[in-house]
Design a protein with these regions (language model features):
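A short acidic, glycine/proline-enriched capping/turn motif at secondary-structure boundaries
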Residues: 20-23, 60-62
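Acidic-residue sensor for enzyme active/binding pockets
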Residues: 14, 36, 56
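Conserved acetyl-CoA-binding loop-helix of GNAT-fold acetyltransferases
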Residues: 18, 24-41
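Terminal substrate-recognition subdomain of acyl/acetyltransferases
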Residues: 44-175
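A conserved beta-strand-loop-helix scaffold within acyl/acetyltransferase catalytic domains
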Residues: 1-22
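Short, well-structured alpha-helical interface segments that form or flank functional binding sites
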Residues: 8-11, 26, 30, 34, ...
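Generic alpha-helix signal with a bias toward terminal, lower-confidence helices
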Residues: 11, 25-28, 39, 65-67, ...
């Protein structure tokens, strides 16, 4: 599932998965390529070229309460090969319902498409992306009133860009 968000001019991947038997055969890469193609087409309908794609990922270094269906270090290697890096920001997903808690231990990852964004993403774009994602995908009407969003917004507002660390480097496998 991919959403195109016009304000940050970005695609957000909510889900991209393959059954275990199909892994290692290029299915995930093909799904990502099609999602990227669709996001680019959506951006062009607004008169712009797509600037980036973002997603959430379990932080491989943080133990989760629910077992992951894939080794998180393997997942990080795969997404690295697909061109994604970890955004160096304090991202916490707000609770999905009143009965749940906010989800810590996640990385916000990004694949820059815009020239000049290989090492960092403009802070305003990160802020806009998360606000629009919360509004449209999570149905949080006023992201500014959400404590998890406010913490991220306050953090990004103090800098011009958010550093983008290649996922292989993040997991310690590359200089």
């Amino acid at each position: 599932i991919l959403d195109y968000l016009e304000l940050p001019n970005a695609g957000v991947l909510e889900f991209l998965f393959t059954v275990a038997a199909a892994r290692g055969q290029g299915v995930g890469r093909a799904l990502l390529a099609e999602a990227e193609r669709l996001a680019k087409a959506d951006a062009l309908r607004t008169g712009r070229a797509l600037e980036w794609i973002a997603a959430e990922m379990n932080d491989p270094f943080v133990a989760t309460e629910v077992p992951d269906n894939m080794d998180p270090f393997v997942r990080a290697r795969i997404w690295h090969r697909w061109g994604f890096g970890a955004l160096d920001c304090p991202y916490v997903q707000p609770a999905l319902s009143a009965e749940q808690r906010p989800a810590e231990g996640l990385l916000l990852i990004a694949k820059p498409i815009s020239a000049g964004w290989s090492d960092a993403v403009p802070s305003l774009q990160v802020r806009r992306l998360v606000a629009e994602y919360l509004r449209w995908a999570m149905r949080i009407e006023d992201p500014e009133a959400n404590p998890q969003y406010r913490a991220l917004a306050d953090w990004v507002d103090r800098r011009a860009t958010v550093e983008l660390t290649p996922l292989a480097r993040y997991i310690g496998e590359w200089g």
